[in-house]
Amino acid sequence: MNKTKLLLILVIVILTMGCIIPAAATPTPDLFATLQASTPSNISEPQVTQPIASPVFNLSTAAPTSITTSAQTPIPSPSSSDQPTGHIVFTCQIFKTQAAEQICIMNADGSGFRRLTTEDNNRHFYPSLSPDGQRVLYSSYLVDNNYEIYQMDIQSGGVARLTNSYGVDDAPEFSPDGQSMTFMHNSPTRNTNQIVISDQGGANAENIPRITGWDPTWSPDGKQILFASDRDGAVQLFTVRRDGSQIHRITNLPAIRGRSDWSADGQFIVTYSGEPWHRELYLMSADGSNVHQLTPSGGNSQGPSFSPDGKWVAFTAYFDKYNDENGCEIYIIRIDGTDLRRLTNNDYCDYQPRWGP
């Protein structure tokens, strides 16, 4: 082959490589970060069919990964009679093309799907059920350009605004006796996240002293609060008594985000950890020992919540639509890492589940 032909081939190869456009990286959603206010566009509401057809899908599971080797709190063996009961509230997008998230509820087996909030152009997040299952707390961007805490009576649909503050109030949760609530308050003047405790109607609100953090969760006896914080540098989980005393760091996991839960018997805590698109659920003893990966790898699992009987965990994951921004669905799994089931099946995101009676 002469030099002219070689030169011609080299020119063609260079031109061809220059035409290849690198694939754009898929944006990584962060569904549990501190909320930023925005006003979604107007759009008509589609009809919602009730209940969801074929709600339960059994998926293959992997054995939970042991993180520690110390003596463990025994995990109850599953029984065929231990089927999920109660209700799960969660954030549902309803409209795939806009950001007007709503609050929805369904039975613990995925049936009986129902939308609770009705303001199409307002965003609603972080629902949680009352101990009697009759009310739901949530954060909403309804008036005054602020996220405030609201309470809805599920039976009547009546809504009451519980907070009226300057800043962001989110992640509310009822105390175990239903008489108080805790939530996170972010003050734009201080730019800090504070944990607040108030009466269940929003009165007598007080910050827990010396605490900065988010995503608070009550202990079953109502004496402690579990929360996420970067007070020691990297984000970890801490417990504190409601008067601000006895602060204990209980985790040493990489890239913890927040939303965690405490089992009703007080023995276990479940959280999630990991880099974007590689997050997993972890089960541990209440003091932070005996950490085990609960979910199979590859689902980008987030936002866990125990069932009232402590035998199941509800969470958000992308097992069926990995790397799809609209691919998050609600799943449940037994606390021994078996019997993974998908409860929702939509073309929009369902996330932030909270289990109740």
Language-model segments: residues:
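N-terminal secretory signal peptides that target proteins for export/translocation
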Residues: 1-2
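Sec-dependent N-terminal signal peptides of Gram-positive bacterial secreted proteins and lipoproteins
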Residues: 5-23
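Sequence signature of WD/YWTD-type beta-propeller architectures
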Residues: 18-357
